[in-house]
Amino acid sequence: MSFFSEHMPIVYQEVQNANASPGTATGLIYAWDEKNQQTDIAAAVPVEAGTKINSPIVQATNIPASKAVCVNYNGAYDKIADAYNSIRQYLAENKLKEKIPSIEQYITGPANEKDTSKWLTKIVFLVE
């Protein structure tokens, strides 16, 4: 997770510079190529609606309220694809259409817990 190690401190600093209270570390996933192990992801933190971020490298993004399918995933990140596959199977079985981005909220992880079995990631799929 070197991407997050590099970028989350910048995101947190810019949010604090805006005098806002950041929520938990979050990933916004816009594309995921499982075959090639590549993703288009943004490091993010939730902030109060209307927060103005005055930064050339960090921007505020509004994600409108939506119906969602959520899964709490416990474990190391190298097995998280199993949770995604289960969610996608559920969406297909229930004829739900996935909206972009999907959201990962890192409730516990390497920054605050060494035992990977205690890592908790909340995965949120916005749906139509």
Can you say where each PLM-predicted feature lies in the sequence?
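A solvent-exposed interaction/effector surface
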Residues: 1-128
